[in-house]
Amino acid sequence: MNFKNSKNCFYIPVSEVRLPTGKMSSRTGENIVYSDFKKEIMGYAISEIKKRYDSLNNKEIEKRARMISIAAIKFNMLKQDLNKVIIFDKKEALRFEGDTGPYVQYAHARCCSILKGAKTEKFNMDLFNGTDYSVVKMIEQFPKAVEKAGEEHKPSLIANYLLELAKTFNEFYAKNQVLKAEDKLRNARLALVFSVRQVLRNGLGLLGIDAPNEM
């Protein structure tokens, strides 16, 4: 490998990638070239975005579709254990709900939306309730997840950690007011949302996946 820092890289083997219909095969026409595969996922992402946001212009749709489709492909591969056969279902991989890259991206975009125009100030963690602390505990686990992923050469540990953080954050947000909370509690929860956003962004970055501000 002739590129900068190649000596610090470690090859991580991946087993077969299969479609839901079965193993890819040139005889059956199920053998897919990556460039064609990427175009197909991109096209599907564009159609899904158009269903949700009919007011977006084509340039913005394409920009978001590119980020989402690449996240869907990368995350679906990286969340798997080493040497495990990967079943790639484009509809499942592109969902904004479930164990997908777009789901984690959407949690990051939601954090950005909450924080837009808001200012975080000094806060008191004593005001937190159970769901607030669930998020705090998840954030605290990030350094260990990254360290273990590096030691064991398992990016899946980071991917699955991000899924758990996104789920924990979404549960917290569904049960608690943030922007409409009392001032002191609002400041505390805004700081919490800021921390979640930063960890999601850092984690996605380690996996080579963009963290969009909007979805």
What residues fall within each predicted segment?
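Non-catalytic interaction-recognition regions
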Residues: 1-215
